[in-house]
Curated annotation (Swiss-Prot):
Protein name: Large ribosomal subunit protein bL33A
Swiss-Prot/TrEMBL GO biological process terms: translation
Top-rank taxon, per record: Bacteria
PANTHER family assigned to the protein according to its UniProt record, in alphabetical order: 50S RIBOSOMAL PROTEIN L33, CHLOROPLASTIC, LARGE RIBOSOMAL SUBUNIT PROTEIN BL33A
Family of the protein in this entry: Belongs to the bacterial ribosomal protein bL33 family.
GO cellular component, one term: ribonucleoprotein complex
One Pfam family this sequence matches: Ribosomal_L33
Keywords: Ribonucleoprotein, Ribosomal protein
GO MF annotations in UniProt: structural constituent of ribosome
PROSITE patterns attached to this UniProt entry: RIBOSOMAL_L33 (PS00582)
Length: 49
C-alpha cells in the first residue's frame, strides 16, 4: 500500500516536497538529497508525515 509522505529539509525545517512510498517494501524512513528553494542549495531531506 502506498502512503503519502512529506520531505522536510533537515537544515531549515521547511517542507518542500510531497511524494509517496510503498510502506511494505520500504518500512524505513527515506533520506534524499534534494534542492531547497529557501536556502538555494542541495540539502538532505528527511521523511515526515
Amino acid at each position: 500500500m502506498r502512503v503519502k509522505i512529506n520531505l522536510k529539509c533537515s537544515s531549515c525545517g521547511s517542507i518542500n516536497y510531497l511524494t509517496s512510498k510503498n510502506s511494505k517494501t520500504h518500512p524505513d524512513k527515506i533520506e534524499v538529497l534534494k534542492y531547497c528553494p529557501k536556502e538555494r542549495k542541495v540539502t538532505l531531506h528527511l521523511e515526515s508525515k
